[in-house]
Amino acid sequence: MNRILIIAGGTGGHIFPALAVARELREQEVDVQWLGVKGGLEEKLVPDSFPLHLIQIKAFRGKRGLQQLLMPLRLVRAVFQAYRIIRQFKPDVILGMGGYVAGPGGLAAWITRTPLIIHEQNSIPGLTNRVLAKMAKFILQGFPDTFPQNRKVITTGNPVRTELVKMPLPQVRLAARRGPLRILVLGGSQGARSINQKMLAALSSYPRSEEIAVWHQTGQRDFEFIQKEYEKIKIEAKVDNFISDMAGAYGWADLVVCRAGALTVCEIASVGVASIFIPYPHAVDNHQFHNARFLEQAGAAIIISEESLAETDLMRWFEQFAQDRDRLLTMAENARKLAKPEAVQRVIAQCKKFYAAR
């Protein structure tokens, strides 16, 4: 049986694409194991059916003083932990999908001479993948032009969940839809306080509340507060701290208001739905803005910077979209044209080149 070690952790933006690949690999009877970080989100999200190995590592950026001095020692420890796991499992190939774990995992792959493939989800590559790109056999990218083109660079798209790829086309879902404008609000897996606050401010002053329905993912921190506030402003709203049924949520929505993480952008393209992006302003290298531009330039999305965001901006867009369903449909169709539904298979095709090659 062929063996693959997947390296991914930290955030849903790394874990969910890796899970999409892992599930398809398991369908193909590949032995898949997972390398993550102790205390990371992967401990909650990776199913028990995938053996999960955990090492100890934290982010390098932003460390000062003693913490900064200790980072080299901690990196060496993490590389050694990953090295032992790789030597024990003996994978045919290692697939790095990002997160803090990718650095030590990728270095351990190089030390053990195990073929390494990396996948960069964002439009601007992170520091870890820029380093690992020199060691990797192939560099897979979710967006075109993330890395300079050479023989190792392949644009696969970002893997998304199968249930999203299989959703009906925008024309089927939206063409005959009537009733309130359905707004899906997402702040990423952890929620986004600024989006939560601006949404409430915009909707509390919206003149015709019957025109709006909301499904709002708040994150755990703001859940109870946001739920109570919707009750006060008399807007039809479903409030969740985390939405697990994303196919149901996207299928329900006419419009998505969200951050611009790579996974969210590619899910929106895969489904085909109009969006307003509010990129996280502190993202490394401003990569969320560049992710969002991928859809905005195609006429599929609106970008509003958080620095200039006012509740009147959101209210104005909501009023326009409530009166112009045709524009929503056009934006949704433009998004769908950019989808790469075969992304999972493209990633796996590169992994197959190293099956039983050792």
UniProtKB/Swiss-Prot annotation:
SS bond partners: none
Recorded topology in the membrane: Peripheral membrane protein
Coiled-coil annotated spans: none
UniProt key word Glycosyltransferase: yes
MF (Gene Ontology): UDP-N-acetyl-D-glucosamine:N-acetylmuramoyl-L-alanyl-D-glutamyl-meso-2,6-diaminopimelyl-D-alanyl-D-alanine-diphosphoundecaprenol 4-beta-N-acetylglucosaminlytransferase activity; undecaprenyldiphospho-muramoylpentapeptide beta-N-acetylglucosaminyltransferase activity
Organism superkingdom: Bacteria
Keyword field: Cell cycle, Cell division, Cell inner membrane, Cell membrane, Cell shape, Cell wall biogenesis/degradation, Glycosyltransferase, Membrane, Peptidoglycan synthesis, Transferase
GO CC annotations on file: plasma membrane
Enzyme category, top tier: transferase
Catalytic activity annotation: di-trans,octa-cis-undecaprenyl diphospho-N-acetyl-alpha-D-muramoyl-L-alanyl-D-glutamyl-meso-2,6-diaminopimeloyl-D-alanyl-D-alanine + UDP-N-acetyl-alpha-D-glucosamine = di-trans,octa-cis-undecaprenyl diphospho-[N-acetyl-alpha-D-glucosaminyl-(1->4)]-N-acetyl-alpha-D-muramoyl-L-alanyl-D-glutamyl-meso-2,6-diaminopimeloyl-D-alanyl-D-alanine + UDP + H(+)
Pathway terms, separated by semicolons: Cell wall biogenesis; peptidoglycan biosynthesis
Cellular localization per UniProt: Cell inner membrane
Gene Ontology biological process terms in this record: carbohydrate metabolic process; cell division; cell wall organization; lipid glycosylation; peptidoglycan biosynthetic process; regulation of cell shape
Keyword rRNA-binding in record: no
EC numbers for this chain: 2.4.1.227
Positions with a binding annotation for UDP-N-acetyl-alpha-D-glucosamine: T11, G12, G13, N122, R161, S189, I243, A262, L263, T264, V265, C266, E267, Q288
Function per UniProt: Cell wall formation. Catalyzes the transfer of a GlcNAc subunit on undecaprenyl-pyrophosphoryl-MurNAc-pentapeptide (lipid intermediate I) to form undecaprenyl-pyrophosphoryl-MurNAc-(pentapeptide)GlcNAc (lipid intermediate II).
PANTHER family, per the entry: GLYCOSYLTRANSFERASE, UDP-N-ACETYLGLUCOSAMINE--N-ACETYLMURAMYL-(PENTAPEPTIDE) PYROPHOSPHORYL-UNDECAPRENOL N-ACETYLGLUCOSAMINE TRANSFERASE 1
UniProt protein name: UDP-N-acetylglucosamine--N-acetylmuramyl-(pentapeptide) pyrophosphoryl-undecaprenol N-acetylglucosamine transferase
Originating organism: Coxiella burnetii (strain Dugway 5J108-111)
Lineage: Bacteria, Pseudomonadati, Pseudomonadota, Gammaproteobacteria, Legionellales
